[in-house]
Amino acid sequence: MIKKIGVLTSGGDAPGMNAAIRGVVRAALTEGLEVFGVYDGYLGLYEDRMVQLDRYSVSDMINRGGTFLGSARFPEFRDEHVREVAIENMKKRGLDALVVIGGDGSYMGAKRLTEMGFPCIGLPGTIDNDIKGTDYTIGFFTALGTVVEAIDRLRDTSSSHQRISIVEVMGRYCGDLTLAAAIAGGCEFIVVPEVEFSREDLVAEIKAGIAKGKKHAIVAITEHICDVDELAKYIEAETKRETRATVLGHIQRGGSPGPYDRILASRMGAYAIDLLLQGHGGRCVGIQNEKLVHHDIIDAIENMKRPFKGDWLDCAKKLY
């Protein structure tokens, strides 16, 4: 019988994490459970830094970006002894389960705790939208709005100067954020990790656009594919058009979450409590076709594949 739970945020922050914490806390309290917030993710779990939360602890949090519990990278959590200390800390406080909000690294920590006998529920919190078993992650749509706003501003100045602009978008090894932003921002060219990249082919496409009368262009590219400053120099040398690169960086993670992320986070947080009360542990929550779903967290990490939105890319190419 679940009586006390913990909740933490881990890895890179994402808009909507506070809304998810709020959803977990208020749904749990409504069901008569006690909730402890863990500061700074798995690091705080190991260092036994927890605080009991009530309804007022999460007041005015639904609209705040970031995570008021804090987050930290803690690679030492891979060590089984470190996890044993974390589990002992939770048991000392009488915790029966843990809700983890974060990306795939956070899920891995939850998976390892589950394998050691401590039930966890994972909620997908990352702007990268790279979590298996869900159509969208908490924070993705807010970050999308931030990126599109930046692209709109870049288009203003690119048009004025007949310039080629490269905009580097977060996403790690998933191109969803780049792809969605490129469609919404009307970018002429898209470079994502799921599709083989050739700078020569990109230049050929840019030249073809110039031949058709294009005065300016925006290239959206996912981070880690190449050095965008070097790419800008190459494009400028080959096209004889002024080319500049803009790295949006961590601004994409900040800001007040948009309505969809607030709703998604709230629904997922409450659903996590439903699952725990039904006796489910070792699960991760997702949304598919606008319905909340849950999967075995071990299976999600080890066996499930995340499909690439190839139809989105096909659409974008038709609109160049």
Curated annotation (Swiss-Prot):
It holds the Pfam family PFK. One of its GO terms (biological process) is fructose 1,6-bisphosphate metabolic process. Allosterically activated by ADP and other diphosphonucleosides, and allosterically inhibited by phosphoenolpyruvate. InterPro entries: ATP_PFK, ATP_PFK_prok-type, PFKA_ATP_prok, Phosphofructokinase_CS, Phosphofructokinase_dom, PKF_sf. It catalyses: beta-D-fructose 6-phosphate + ATP = beta-D-fructose 1,6-bisphosphate + ADP + H(+). Its cofactor is Mg(2+). Disulfide bonds: none annotated. ADP binds at residues 22-26, 55-60, 155, 186-188, 212, 214-216. It is found in: Cytoplasm. GO terms for cellular component: 6-phosphofructokinase complex. The keyword ATP-binding applies. Catalyzes the phosphorylation of D-fructose 6-phosphate to fructose 1,6-bisphosphate by ATP, the first committing step of glycolysis. Belongs to the phosphofructokinase type A (PFKA) family. ATP-dependent PFK group I subfamily. Prokaryotic clade 'B1' sub-subfamily. This is ATP-dependent 6-phosphofructokinase.
